[in-house]
């Protein structure tokens, strides 16, 4: 686990998490103490004889491994609470003992923990709790609880569960390193306990949300049953039945509100984070295992899965569509003036930009669906790679810690320090996640090298008379090969990318995505023009294409051999032509790649508290910030500020400023089009509303408002 959950200075004044010692005044206890009296009754299947036994009475019959007998005796001699403060003591022996019990008898973690020590480890259960009983009252008209009261009960219950889960995870962290002849066996025993704790934490962290959802579903069933009863009810009973139905509808509204509030609450976030801590060992193991399925020569599958659709896409939109449009306009619109050149650039860019987004949104989902349909995704490992979830592998820090074996609450300063540490670690991981994409300097350079290199090779082969490299198909194929090489390079980087956590574990940054694709959903995600975000993407691609074409058209033409001349061009002319071919490709792609990252950059800027001041111009604001604040943390960086005295970071900042300069004119135009788009749609909606024929109910309501009808 990440060490920041335990961290904090040793000499600070402590806030106690629990209070069970008779000699300590109650006011020194932690306000969210998890005492025995706060725990709900056990469910029937958990209230066996072990629940009523004391630790001393039950421990004699605990089925631990023979090698753990002395450990059990030492555990029995421990104090459950600190002698002075009354805070719970974190046992370094308990996790191994629970694992030993679980190996002998596979029961849920919460049952076995209580079996080890009922006084110390009676865990908080949703089943049978006051909270569950209170939620059940929502289905009883006339007994519906107060929303604020239930909300506080939910909050307190969630805090208690999170405290207990943190206690148990800290208990596992406190287990000493296994040594001696039983080291391997004890390590496996600890892993059993850790896995069981993770499973319990998963259930416990979801119990409140599932309980609320079940209560809402139960109310729906009651309402449906009442609707059936009302159909056959006598007239005299209908009034009371309608009242009961309305009470249930109101109760459902309250529960839906409580559920929505809880899902967004800090308590729910903390529960999810604590559960992630308890499951982290298994999550990392699963990620490593999954990555190993595409390790070595098996990595050819993901590379092909990325290269083939990118080859088809690049050959189509960068090759055939853009170049055929350019060739057609060259014959149609003579280059007589700058206006004619701008007109051609506008047409070529708009067509190519729209084609770029359309083809990418169609080809890749269809190719992935075809792989899954034929089974090649599994047989040949032809699966895409996806980034791991940052918050899952780097959860929020704990609020509690172990201080000399006592469970205590961290001070606000310690919490702030740990949060800053987690934030910095997440930034490192997020940098690795975007490093291979075309929205990162490294990823962009890969793409520029691949596309520029393929066009340079095509031009060279043409100039030395090996191929006719000026045909439409030759240029389109070169674009396709560039796309394939770019996608292959980026996938290869993803296959090798790892994040090393503070404990030295190597965690894969990308993992194979074997989830079943939904072709219709995937196509709509990029092609549903009813969505403002999709339309904005098309606007950005079209306007980026115009700017790209304008930049490319400013380049001088390649040197061609005079008609009827024999031999080949000079070496200098060939090198110049290769450079021009590569530069033309890079100049066109630079604006496209720069602008396609604006959406993510705007979101990151807003999350960092630096954006959102002008929502109508948020894309322009992002471009300006890239020029004015290229060193900000929300931008992807390859180098840290301290690397080589900051010199590489200065060069990278200049790179981001250049990107911002390319983004600014395009995104100003995009924001303008967005405003016009929104205005037109609002005007159309208003016109439709105005033309809509009034209904009889509308006429009656208007007459009632004007006093023409008497209310009944």
Curated annotation (Swiss-Prot):
Domain of life: Bacteria
Membrane among keywords: yes
Cellular component per GO, a single term: membrane
Localization of this protein: Secreted; Host membrane
The UniProt record lists the keyword Metal-binding: no
Ranges of Polar residues composition bias in the record: 44-57
Induction: Transcriptionally induced by HrpL.
Main subcellular location: secreted
Region entry Disordered, spans: 22-58
Keyword line: Host membrane, Membrane, Secreted, Virulence
Reported function: Involved in the suppression of basal resistance and promotion of disease symptoms in plants. Mediates the ubiquitination and degradation, via the host proteasome, of a low-abundance immunity-associated protein in Arabidopsis thaliana. May be involved in the inhibition of a host vesicle trafficking pathway.
Subunit field text: Interacts with the chaperone ShcM. Interacts with host plant BIG5/ATMIN7.
Protein's recorded name: Effector protein HopM1
Lineage: Bacteria, Pseudomonadati, Pseudomonadota, Gammaproteobacteria, Pseudomonadales
Gene name tied to this protein: hopM1
């Amino acid at each position: 686990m990440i060490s920041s959950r335990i961290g904090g200075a040793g000499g600070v004044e402590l806030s106690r998490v629990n209070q069970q010692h008779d000699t300590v005044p109650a006011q020194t206890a932690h306000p969210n103490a998890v005492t025995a009296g706060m725990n709900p009754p056990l469910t029937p299947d958990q209230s066996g004889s072990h629940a009523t036994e004391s630790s001393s009475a039950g421990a004699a019959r605990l089925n631990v491994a023979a090698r753990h007998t002395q450990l059990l005796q030492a555990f029995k001699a421990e104090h459950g609470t600190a002698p002075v403060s009354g805070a719970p003591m974190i046992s370094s022996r308990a996790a191994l003992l629970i694992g030993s019990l679980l190996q002998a008898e596979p029961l849920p973690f919460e049952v076995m923990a209580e079996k080890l020590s009922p006084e110390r480890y009676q865990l908080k259960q949703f089943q049978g709790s006051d909270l569950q009983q209170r939620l059940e009252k929502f289905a009883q008209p006339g007994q519906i609880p107060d929303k604020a009261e239930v909300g506080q009960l939910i909050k307190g219950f969630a805090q208690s569960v999170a405290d207990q889960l943190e206690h148990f995870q800290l208990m596992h962290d406190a287990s000493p390193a296994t040594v001696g002849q039983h080291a391997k066996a004890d390590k496996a025993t600890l892993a059993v306990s850790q896995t069981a704790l993770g499973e319990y934490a998963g259930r416990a962290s979801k119990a409140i949300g599932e309980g609320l959802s079940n209560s809402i579903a139960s109310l729906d069933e009651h309402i449906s049953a009442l609707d059936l009863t009302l159909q056959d009810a006598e007239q005299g009973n209908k009034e009371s039945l309608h009242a009961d139905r309305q009470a249930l509808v109101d109760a459902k509204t309250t529960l839906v509100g409580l559920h929505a509030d809880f899902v967004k609450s800090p308590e729910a976030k903390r529960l999810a984070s604590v559960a992630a801590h308890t499951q982290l060992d298994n999550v990392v193991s699963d990620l490593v295992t999954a990555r190993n399925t595409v390790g070595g020569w098996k990595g050819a599958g993901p590379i092909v899965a990325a290269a083939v659709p990118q080859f088809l896409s690049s050959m189509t939109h960068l090759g055939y569509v853009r170049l055929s449009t350019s060739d057609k306009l060259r014959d149609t619109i003579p280059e007589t003036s700058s206006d004619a050149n701008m007109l051609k650039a506008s047409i070529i860019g708009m067509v190519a930009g729209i084609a770029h987004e359309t083809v990418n949104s169609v080809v890749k989902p269809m190719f992935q669906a075809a792989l899954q349909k034929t089974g090649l995704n599994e047989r040949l490992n032809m699966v895409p790679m996806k980034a791991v979830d940052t918050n899952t592998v780097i959860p929020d820090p704990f609020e509690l810690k172990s201080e000399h074996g006592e469970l205590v609450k961290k001070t606000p300063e310690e919490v702030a320090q740990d949060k800053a540490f987690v934030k910095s670690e997440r930034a490192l991981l997020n940098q690795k996640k975007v490093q291979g994409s075309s929205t990162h300097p490294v990823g962009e350079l890969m793409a520029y090298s691949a596309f520029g290199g393929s066009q340079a090779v095509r031009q060279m082969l043409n100039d030395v008379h090996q191929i006719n490299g000026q045909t439409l198909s030759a240029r389109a194929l070169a674009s396709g090969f560039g796309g394939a090489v770019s996608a292959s390079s980026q996938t290869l980087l993803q296959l090798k990318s790892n994040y090393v956590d503070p404990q030295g574990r190597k965690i894969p940054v990308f993992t194979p995505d074997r989830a079943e694709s939904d072709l219709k959903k995937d196509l709509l995600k990029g092609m549903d023009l009813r969505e403002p975000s999709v339309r904005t993407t098309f606007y950005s691609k079209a306007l980026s294409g115009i700017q790209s074409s304008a930049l490319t058209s400013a380049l001088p033409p390649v040197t061609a051999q005079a008609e009827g001349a024999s031999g080949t061009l000079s070496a200098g002319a060939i090198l110049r032509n290769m450079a021009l071919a590569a530069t033309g490709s890079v100049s066109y792609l630079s604006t496209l790649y720069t602008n396609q990252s604006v959406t993510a950059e705007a979101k990151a800027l807003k999350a960092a508290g630096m954006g959102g001041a002008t929502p109508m111009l948020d894309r322009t604001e992002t471009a300006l910030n890239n020029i004015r604040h290229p060193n900000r943390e929300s931008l992807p960086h390859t180098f840290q500020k301290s690397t080589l005295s900051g010199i590489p970071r200065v060069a990278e900042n200049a790179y981001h400023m250049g990107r911002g300069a390319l983004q600014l004119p395009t995104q100003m135009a995009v924001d303008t089009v967005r405003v016009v788009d929104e205005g037109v749609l609002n005007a159309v909606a208003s016109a439709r509303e105005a033309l809509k024929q009034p209904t009889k109910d509308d006429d009656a309501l208007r007459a009632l408002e004007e006093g023409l009808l008497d209310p009944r």
